[in-house]
């Protein structure tokens, strides 16, 4: 499989901005068009660095909204391997243990790879691997309310810990790294993951790249 046979789409934006929703929508609709074995989704979160050598007290102090928390080098390597026609083993990250598990998820080469993550557009090397990129431009207050509900319900977090993390790292890192990366996006999507027009534009772009 040559690189031109694999289209990589990056979907970035603040935490809880609608990235996963639009990625899921694109995935499901392209699966109907191309087949389920031709589309893959990679979450940037899977590439948080392994912290198994640290105590839990040390792990919770990590700034997970800083680019250094992520192993983008491994992600870039995996994208290049997929483009070359090789399968890759993607790490599995535990939000409750704040480190990688011993498990891996094998991903085989696909026609379309959808990346989604908060810091994708901050890395020049990652941007070079993308054929098109999207930034979810959702107001921060809406993102915060969604994140609060999600992290308490799904990730074993307390309300106080989510609020503290937001004020100490999430919001400052968004302003320092994530929002400035919007300039590198090909498509800026307002109103979250349910923006049907933006979804159709992105699908059309993918189909054009595959033609």
Curated annotation (Swiss-Prot):
GO BP terms, alphabetized: CTP salvage; UMP salvage
Disulphides: none
Pathway(s) served: Pyrimidine metabolism; CTP biosynthesis via salvage pathway; CTP from cytidine: step 1/3; Pyrimidine metabolism; UMP biosynthesis via salvage pathway; UMP from uridine: step 1/1
Membrane-crossing segments per the record: none
Cellular localization per UniProt: Cytoplasm
Chief location category: cytoplasm
Keyword Nucleotide-binding attributed: yes
Binding site for ATP: 13-20
Broad enzyme group: transferase
InterPro entries listed in its UniProt record: P-loop_NTPase, PRK/URK, Uridine_kinase, Uridine_kinase-like
Keywords from the UniProt entry: ATP-binding, Cytoplasm, Kinase, Nucleotide-binding, Transferase
Entry-linked Pfam families: PRK
EC nos: 2.7.1.48
Gene Ontology CC annotation, any one: cytoplasm
Catalytic activity: uridine + ATP = UMP + ADP + H(+); cytidine + ATP = CMP + ADP + H(+)
A GO term, aspect molecular function: cytidine kinase activity
Domain of life: Bacteria
HAMAP family: Uridine_kinase (MF_00551)
Family classification: Belongs to the uridine kinase family.
Name of the molecule in the record: Uridine kinase
Organism of this sequence: Shewanella pealeana (strain ATCC 700345 / ANG-SQ1)
């Amino acid at each position: 499989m040559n690189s031109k046979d694999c289209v990589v789409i990056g979907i970035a934006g603040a935490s809880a901005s609608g990235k996963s929703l639009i990625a899921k929508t694109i995935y499901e609709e392209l699966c109907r068009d191309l087949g389920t074995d031709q589309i893959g989704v990679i979450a940037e979160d899977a590439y948080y660095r392994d912290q198994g050598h640290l105590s839990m007290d040390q792990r919770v102090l990590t700034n997970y909204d800083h680019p250094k928390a992520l192993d983008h080098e491994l992600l870039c390597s995996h994208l290049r391997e997929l483009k070359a026609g090789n399968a890759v083993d993607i790490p599995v990250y535990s939000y409750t243990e704040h480190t990688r598990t011993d498990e891996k998820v094998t991903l085989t080469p696909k026609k379309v790879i959808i990346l989604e993550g908060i810091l994708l557009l901050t890395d020049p090397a990652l941007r070079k691997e993308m054929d098109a990129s999207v930034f979810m431009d959702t107001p921060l207050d809406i993102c915060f309310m969604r994140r609060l509900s999600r992290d308490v319900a799904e990730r074993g977090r307390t309300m106080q810990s989510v609020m503290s993390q937001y004020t100490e790292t999430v919001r400052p890192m968004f302003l320092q790294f994530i929002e400035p990366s919007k300039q590198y996006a090909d498509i800026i999507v307002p109103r979250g993951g349910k923006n049907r027009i933006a979804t159709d534009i992105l699908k059309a772009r993918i189909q054009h790249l595959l033609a």
